[in-house]
A protein has these predicted regions:
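Flexible coil segments in periplasmic/lumen-exposed cytochrome c-class electron-transfer proteins
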Residues: 24-111, 153-266, 302-354, 365
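Short, intrinsically disordered C-terminal tails of secreted or membrane-associated proteins
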Residues: 364, 368-378
Length: 379
């Protein structure tokens, strides 16, 4: 049985590495910031050069075997696990009917959203978890990708380049359908479990994700100034895209308390809600992947994200240190979203890059005013 599991993991790795290479849009020739928090990006060591005359790895043929996953009554073939003709959905009871753009996509222009972000929208450390995002926020992010206003500080982050390509190809109807589907899904509780440690399990990096080493390679090492986020149930369930298999985020001892103090100082709750559960079009933060959150904060800091409302975040992140990123993302990830959906879902249409958010009165977001007057604030 162990050999079967290993063969399955190897099969999925071959398939996904081929997909990633085929789908990544060319990255611009930009330098990598010298202060990049590599733990958040899962930066992989350079691959060895291919052997002369070596044929590219190919996935094993689908022999029709039905694969099963613990906790699911669904059975899938290897072809179905690759997302053909629709994404692997081990837990259809988690959600309502999926629109075609989420379940099938429109290949080759647009990959199915649910393949990478999962049918329940919980996402994975290397990407985003769109579950529970308001329709207006989701659509605005797609506009930002489309208009090159949302990139990655690290040009090697291939799936961001891929998202930019998808956003340029997706129709407004497809984007809206995906936005409405994910907005209706609950923000998951306990998806990320935060553990404060001084020593962290040794890991390897594959596909920008950390996996705990096993066997003779297993061991511990100092965590240092990092967050190490790993699949809670190992690599096999991760590679099979199990939407019930969450993550463990190992953080330095004391990081959560320090992050709480920093969030209070920056008054994050003024815009993101009292419990960071989101407020109107402002996204929920509680319980989200610390790897993802650190990338976004750093992208605001470097200007890689400079879409609508990014000016509100710039003063917040301007002086954040590498330690601040670790602490505040540890705190954010440690907070569970509310059991009931108390978010105020925004109904407004996404604003263009030439429009400005309008606020009544002087609402304060952190240390800066959220009040904008149309035409007077650069985005």
């Amino acid at each position: 049985m162990r050999k079967i599991h290993l063969a399955l993991v190897a099969f999925v790795l071959v398939v996904m590495s081929g997909y990633a290479l085929a789908q990544q849009a060319p990255a611009p020739a930009r330098p990598v910031p010298t202060n990049l928090p590599e733990w958040a990006w899962g930066v992989m060591p350079p691959a060895p050069p291919p052997q002369p005359g070596a044929a590219p790895a190919a996935p094993p043929a689908d022999d029709g075997s039905i694969l099963h996953l613990e906790g699911s009554s669904v059975g899938l073939t290897r072809t179905q696990l690759r997302g053909i003709p629709s994404i692997p959905d081990w837990h259809p009871e988690d959600h309502g009917p999926m629109p075609d753009i989420v379940s099938k996509g429109r290949m080759p222009a647009v990959r199915a959203c649910g393949f990478c972000h999962l049918p329940n929208g919980r996402g994975r450390p290397e990407n985003a978890g769109p579950a529970g995002l308001s329709v207006s926020y989701f659509m605005q992010q797609m506009e930002d990708f489309k208009n090159d206003l949302r990139k990655s500080s690290d040009p090697r982050k291939g799936n961001v380049n891929t998202m930019i390509g998808f956003a340029k190809q997706a129709t407004p109807e497809e984007v809206k359908a995906a936005a409405e589907y994910f907005a209706a899904l609950p923000i998951p509780q306990g998806w990320v479990k935060v553990k404060e440690v001084s020593m962290v399990p040794k890991t390897k990096i594959q596909g920008n994700v950390y996996f705990e080493l096993e066997g003779a390679q297993a061991g511990k090492e100092p965590i240092g100034n990092r967050v190490i986020e790993v699949p809670e149930h190992g690599q096999e369930r991760f590679e099979m895209r199990d939407g019930h298999a969450g993550y463990i985020a190992y953080v330095p001892v004391g990081a959560v308390k320090k992050g709480e103090a920093l969030a209070s100082k920056l008054q994050c709750s003024m815009c993101h809600g009292a419990n960071l559960e989101g407020l109107g079009p402002v996204p929920a933060l509680a319980g989200r992947s610390p790897s993802y959150m650190a990338r976004q904060l750093f992208d605001f800091q470097t200007g890689a994200r400079h879409g609508l409302w990014s000016d509100l975040m710039k003063p917040i992140v301007a002086k954040m240190t590498a330690e601040d990123l670790v602490n505040i993302t540890a705190y954010i990830a440690s907070k569970n979203p509310p059991a009931a959906d108390v978010r105020q879902t925004a109904r407004a249409k996404p604003q263009s890059r030439h429009s400005r958010p309008m606020w009544n009165g002087s609402t304060i977001c952190g240390s800066i005013s959220c009040r904008f007057v149309s035409g007077h604030s650069r985005v």
